[in-house]
UniProtKB/Swiss-Prot annotation:
Its main location: mitochondrion. Binds a dinuclear copper A center per subunit. It is a multi-pass membrane protein. Cu cation A2 binds at residues 196, 198, 200, 204. Component of the cytochrome c oxidase, the last enzyme in the mitochondrial electron transport chain which drives oxidative phosphorylation. The respiratory chain contains 3 multisubunit complexes succinate dehydrogenase (complex II, CII), ubiquinol-cytochrome c oxidoreductase (cytochrome b-c1 complex, complex III, CIII) and cytochrome c oxidase (complex IV, CIV), that cooperate to transfer electrons derived from NADH and succinate to molecular oxygen, creating an electrochemical gradient over the inner membrane that drives transmembrane transport and the ATP synthase. The lineage of its organism: Eukaryota, Metazoa, Chordata, Craniata, Vertebrata. Cu cation A1 binds at residues 161, 196, 200, 207. The gene is MT-CO2. SUPFAM superfamilies: Cupredoxins, Cytochrome c oxidase subunit II-like, transmembrane region. This is Cytochrome c oxidase subunit 2. Its EC number is 7.1.1.9. Keywords: Copper, Electron transport, Magnesium, Membrane, Metal-binding, Mitochondrion, Mitochondrion inner membrane, Phosphoprotein, Respiratory chain, Translocase, Transmembrane, Transmembrane helix, Transport. Component of the cytochrome c oxidase (complex IV, CIV), a multisubunit enzyme composed of 14 subunits. The complex is composed of a catalytic core of 3 subunits MT-CO1, MT-CO2 and MT-CO3, encoded in the mitochondrial DNA, and 11 supernumerary subunits COX4I, COX5A, COX5B, COX6A, COX6B, COX6C, COX7A, COX7B, COX7C, COX8 and NDUFA4, which are encoded in the nuclear genome. PROSITE patterns: COX2 (PS00078), COX2_CUA (PS50857), COX2_TM (PS50999). Belongs to the cytochrome c oxidase subunit 2 family.
Length: 227
């Protein structure tokens, strides 16, 4: 989860988020190099009175500043496309969870189990226990097994919502009448927080998401107790 005054992204918990962080660093380095080059050229233009008479009519220079940006765009596009394809792949999920957005709460249905469904509301500030997080805690957490591929089917009952958990690299729109899907996979156990990331009305800020990733044994015990 994010902390006050935090710089940078949240700690990666899934392989997709690790890839996204690597891509962020890769792109940031390219942007830094381009910005440094531009600032250097501007400083030269401002500090020197010397000019090249054929600068504005140099075929070689035009060739360079046409090919070089194209090569840079390719360096950015290739890893980006690779990650997009990875995010779309869902290979043999062990579990499917249907997520529905409402104004202003989430409902979850474990489609592999009979009658395992519940609504998830934010806990009001006055009802929080010591150590719990304001505007992030819910009355029913989404319990999932760790280190296993899980398919999330995401839609909405009313208006546009967006189901997002940053530390897992997840952000999928919940659109009425349309079913989107995403893959959830966690490398470690723990609580992972998210929020609705699409302005959906006056209580948009009060739609937190809490995933509780546990070992498979504990998940089986939890699911048996819920049925």
């Amino acid at each position: 989860m994010a902390y006050p005054l935090q710089l940078g992204l949240q700690d990666a918990t899934s392989p997709i988020m690790e890839e996204l962080m690597n891509f962020h660093d890769h792109t940031l380095m390219i942007v830094f190099l381009i910005s440094s080059l531009v600032l250097y050229i501007i400083s030269l233009m401002l500090t020197t009175k010397l000019t090249h008479t054929s600068t504005m009519d140099a075929q070689e220079v035009e060739t360079i500043w046409t090919i070089l940006p194209a090569a840079i765009l390719v360096l950015i596009a290739l890893p980006s496309l690779r990650i997009l394809y990875m995010m779309d792949e869902i290979n043999n999920p062990v579990l499917t969870v249907k997520t529905m957005g409402h104004q202003w709460y989430w409902s979850y249905e474990y489609t592999d189990y009979e009658d395992l469904c519940f609504d998830s509301y934010m806990i009001p500030t006055n009802d929080l226990k010591p150590g719990e997080l304001r505007l992030l805690e819910v009355d029913n957490r989404v319990v999932l097994p760790m280190e296993l591929p899980i398919r999330m089917l995401i839609s909405s009952e009313d208006v546009l919502h967006s189901w997002a958990v940053p530390s897992l690299g997840l952000k999928t729109d919940a659109i009425p009448g349309r079913l989107n899907q995403a893959t959830v996979s966690s490398n470690r156990p723990g609580l992972f927080y998210g929020q609705c990331s699409e302005i959906c009305g006056s209580n948009h800020s009060f739609m937190p998401i809490v995933l509780e990733m546990v070992p498979l044994k504990y998940f089986e015990n939890w699911s048996a107790s819920m049925i």
